[in-house]
UniProtKB/Swiss-Prot annotation:
Organism annotation: Xylella fastidiosa (strain Temecula1 / ATCC 700964)
Free-text comment on the cofactor: Binds 1 divalent metal cation per subunit. Can use either Co(2+) or Zn(2+).
One Pfam family cited in the UniProt record for this chain: DHQ_synthase
Protein name per UniProt: 3-dehydroquinate synthase
Entry's Gene Ontology cellular component terms: cytoplasm
Length: 370
C-alpha cells in the first residue's frame, strides 16, 4: 500500500506572516480555503490551460464552505504575454463588476504568470486587498508564489511594473503536478536546483541523486523538493522582504535569463522560445562561467552545475540568433543595477552566491559571445 504524502507547512515571517501549505488534495479542503476569505467577495483568476482542469473544483470547494460568497472566475490566455498592463486593467474591471470591497479576496489559480498578475491586481485594488496563491506549476510552488513580488511586463522588460504585496496564504496542491507537461516540470526543477546552487550544497547533492524520482513525479520526492525550496526562500524573504540585501541572491541566473526571455520573445504554449525556468538554467550557467572568468569560482563547479542541468533535460547554452549586444541592451535595464552599472548575482562555487556590483561589460560580452 502506498504511504500517503504528509501535509507540509512552511511559515514566511514577513509583515504580515503567512503559511505555505504543501500536499495533495488541498483543492478539496473547504475549511482551509475558506479561512483565507475575510469578506463576501472573491475572484478566481486563472488561465486557459489551468481553468478547465481546476477552476470548477476551487469554485465548488469555496462555495461549499461559504455559500454566501459572491464568487466569479476570470480566465486569461495561457502564457507570459498575458502578464500585461492590458490584462491588469481587465482584472481590475472584473473586481469592479463583482462589487469587490476592501475585504475581498483574489485567488491566483495557475503558474507564475497568473500569480504575478493576480498579486499586482490585488495590490492595486482599493490600495490593497487579500489574495491567495494557489500554484499549479512546480515553478510557481517553489518560487513565484512565495515572497510577495507582484508585477506585469512591458515591452522594455520583464516585471518592470509591480509592487511588493505578500499573499494571505499559499496553498500548493501537489496533485496538480500530475497534469503538468514534462517541459514545465523541468522548468520548475531549474528553480529548485538554484536553491542548492546558491546556499545548500547538501540539497544540491540530493538533487544529483534523486533526479529519476523527481522526473518520474514521485510524490514524496516532489514534496521534499518543494518544501526545502520554500524553506530556503522563506528564510531569506523573512529577513529581507523588500529585496534590500540578501534576497537579491535568489536571482542567480535571472539577469541573463530575463534578457533572453525579452529578447527572443516570451514563451507561449507550443512555442520553441525558452520559458522562464529554461532561461534561468541558461542564465545560471552563464553566471557560473562569468564567475570563473572573474576568478570568483572554480571551473569544476561550473561544470558540475552544467552537468546537473543537462541531466534534468534543461538547456545550458544560449539560443541561436541572440547577439551579445542584444542581450546587454536588456541587461542594462535590470532592476538590480546601481547607477547605470551592471550588478549581477554570481557565485563562489556550489552553495555560495553573492551580488557583485559594477561588473565589467567587456567580461559579460565575452561570455555571451562564447
Amino acid at each position: 500500500m502506498t504511504t500517503p504524502t504528509p501535509l507540509r507547512s512552511v511559515t514566511v515571517n514577513t509583515p504580515p506572516p503567512y503559511t505555505i501549505a504543501i500536499g495533495p488534495g488541498l483543492l478539496h479542503d473547504p475549511p482551509r480555503l475558506a479561512a483565507t476569505i475575510r469578506g463576501r467577495h472573491a475572484l478566481i483568476l486563472s488561465d486557459s490551460e489551468v481553468a478547465p482542469r481546476y477552476a470548477a473544483q476551487l469554485h465548488e470547494t469555496l462555495l461549499r464552505a461559504r455559500p454566501d460568497l459572491h464568487l466569479n472566475v476570470f480566465t486569461l490566455p495561457a502564457g507570459e504575454t498575458s502578464k500585461s498592463l492590458e490584462n491588469f486593467g481587465a482584472a481590475i474591471a472584473q473586481l469592479a463588476t463583482l462589487g469587490a470591497t476592501r475585504d475581498a479576496c483574489l485567488f491566483a489559480l495557475g503558474g507564475g504568470v497568473i500569480g504575478d498578475l493576480a498579486g499586482f491586481t490585488a495590490a492595486c485594488w482599493m490600495r490593497g486587498i487579500d489574495y491567495v496563491q494557489v500554484p499549479t506549476t512546480l515553478l510557481a510552488m517553489v518560487d513565484s508564489s512565495v515572497g510577495g513580488k507582484t508585477a506585469v511586463d512591458i515591452p522594455q522588460g520583464k516585471n518592470m511594473v509591480g509592487a511588493f504585496h505578500p499573499p494571505r496564504a499559499v496553498i500548493a496542491d501537489t496533485d496538480t503536478l500530475a497534469t503538468l507537461p514534462l517541459r514545465e516540470l523541468r522548468a520548475g526543477l531549474s528553480e529548485v536546483i538554484k536553491y542548492g546552487a546558491i546556499r545548500d550544497p547538501v540539497f544540491f547533492h540530493w538533487l544529483q541523486t534523486t533526479r529519476e524520482a523527481l522526473l518520474a513525479r514521485d510524490p514524496a520526492a516532489l514534496a521534499q523538493a518543494i518544501a526545502r525550496s520554500c524553506e530556503h526562500k522563506a528564510d531569506i524573504v523573512g529577513r529581507d522582504p523588500l529585496e534590500k540585501g540578501e534576497r537579491v541572491l535568489l536571482n542567480l541566473g535571472h539577469t541573463f535569463g530575463h534578457a533572453i526571455e525579452t529578447t527572443q520573445g516570451y514563451s507561449t504554449p507550443g512555442s520553441n522560445n525558452l520559458n522562464h525556468g529554461e532561461a534561468v538554467a541558461v542564465g545560471m550557467v552563464l553566471a557560473a562561467r562569468l564567475s570563473n572568468t572573474l576568478g570568483l569560482a572554480p571551473a569544476e563547479d561550473t561544470e558540475t552545475l552544467k552537468n546537473l542541468l543537462d541531466a534534468y533535460g534543461l538547456p545550458t547554452v544560449l539560443p541561436s540568433g541572440l547577439t551579445p549586444e542584444m542581450l546587454l541592451e536588456r541587461m542594462r535595464l535590470d532592476k538590480k543595477n546601481i547607477a547605470g552599472r551592471l550588478r549581477l548575482v554570481l557565485w563562489r562555487g556550489i552553495g555560495h552566491a553573492e551580488a557583485v556590483p559594477d561588473v565589467d561589460e567587456a567580461a559579460v560580452r565575452q561570455i555571451l559571445a562564447n
